[in-house]
Design a protein with these regions (language model features):
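Proteolytic maturation boundary segments
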Residues: 1-26, 32-33, 37, 48-52, ...
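A structural supersecondary motif
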Residues: 24, 48-82
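Feature marking long nucleic-acid-engaging regions of large polymerase/nuclease enzymes
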Residues: 28-41, 53, 66-69, 107
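Intrinsically disordered or highly flexible coil/loop and linker segments, enriched in small
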Residues: 32, 52, 56-61, 101-108, ...
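Detector for Asparagine
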Residues: 33, 53, 59, 63, ...
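M16/insulysin-pitrilysin zinc metalloprotease superfamily fold
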Residues: 70-130, 145-149, 159-165
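Aromatic/basic-lined ligand-recognition segments
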Residues: 135-136
Length: 236
C-alpha cells in the first residue's frame, strides 16, 4: 500500500553527471489470463509506445514506461534528466502539457496505425523448446498472479485483430485512467547533482505539472517518415 499524496525522495550526488527526476504513478496491474485481459495488458504497452513516439516527435525529453512493481500495482513512470532543478521542472511542464493535449485531442489516426504496426512486429508465439528455468518462471507467474501466455497461432491472431482495432479514444481513456491515480499517490525520486541550492520540494513538482496543464496546448501535425525500400542484392 502507498500513503496518499505526494512522496518525494531526494539523494545528493556530486559525480559529474546530470540530475535525474522520476515521477511514478502506482496503478492497478492487469492479470492476463484470457484473450481479453491479455489484450488489456498489450493495450498498456501500446499506449506507452504511442506516448513515446509522440514525445520524440515533439522533441520532449522524457522516458516513459509502465511495469509491474509489487503486489497488484504497476508504476507508470516519467523519467527526466537535466542540468539543474529549473531545467527538470521545465521538462515536467512540457510533459504535462503534452499529456493534456493527448487527453483532449487524442492521437492522429496515422500515429495510432504506426504504433500498432510497430507493436505487432514484436508479437509472436514462442514455439521454441523452453528451458526448465523459463518453465519455472512461467509457473511462478501463474501461481502468484494467475498470468497466462499466448500458446497458439489462433490465439495470437485473435489478439492481433483486437490490437489492430484499437483507436485513439481507447488509448485516451486508458491514459486518463492511469493519470487519475496521480491524485491518489505520486512518488517522486530526485537525484540532485547540482548542489543544495537545487534541492526540490514536492510542491514545486506539483506546480510544474499544473502549469503545463494550464499553458496553451501546442499545435500538432503528424507526418509519417518516408520508409526507404530495402535493397536486396541477389547473387549474379
Amino acid at each position: 500500500t502507498y500513503d496518499p499524496g505526494v512522496e518525494l525522495y531526494e539523494i545528493g550526488d556530486d559525480l559529474e553527471r546530470s540530475s535525474e527526476l522520476e515521477l511514478m504513478i502506482p496503478h492497478p496491474c492487469v492479470i492476463g489470463n484470457t484473450i481479453g485481459s491479455i489484450y488489456q495488458k498489450e493495450l498498456g504497452s501500446l499506449l506507452i509506445r504511442a506516448i513515446s513516439n509522440r514525445l520524440k516527435y515533439q522533441n520532449i525529453r522524457c522516458n516513459v514506461s509502465d511495469a509491474w512493481f509489487l503486489s497488484d500495482k504497476n508504476h507508470f513512470v516519467f523519467a527526466f534528466s537535466g542540468v539543474d532543478k529549473a531545467n527538470l521542472l521545465q521538462q515536467v511542464s512540457e510533459l504535462s502539457n503534452e499529456m493534456e493535449s493527448i487527453q483532449k485531442n487524442g492521437f492522429k489516426q496515422e500515429e495510432v496505425e504506426d504504433a500498432i504496426n510497430e507493436h505487432l512486429r514484436r508479437l509472436k508465439v514462442d514455439n521454441s523448446t523452453q528451458l526448465s528455468s523459463k518453465w519455472c518462471d512461467d509457473f511462478v507467474d501463474y501461481v502468484i498472479s494467475d498470468d497466462r501466455y499466448i500458446q497458439s497461432d489462433s490465439e495470437m491472431k485473435q489478439l492481433a485483430d483486437k490490437i489492430r482495432a484499437t483507436d485513439s479514444a481507447t488509448l485516451q481513456q486508458l491514459l486518463r485512467e492511469w493519470l487519475s491515480y496521480k491524485d491518489q499517490t505520486l512518488l517522486v525520486a530526485y537525484r540532485n547533482n547540482a548542489g543544495k541550492q537545487n534541492s526540490l520540494k514536492k510542491e514545486e513538482v506539483v506546480q510544474a505539472w499544473d502549469e503545463g496543464i494550464k499553458n496553451p496546448l501546442k499545435d500538432f501535425t503528424y507526418a509519417r517518415k518516408d520508409v526507404k525500400e530495402e535493397r536486396v542484392v541477389t547473387p549474379a
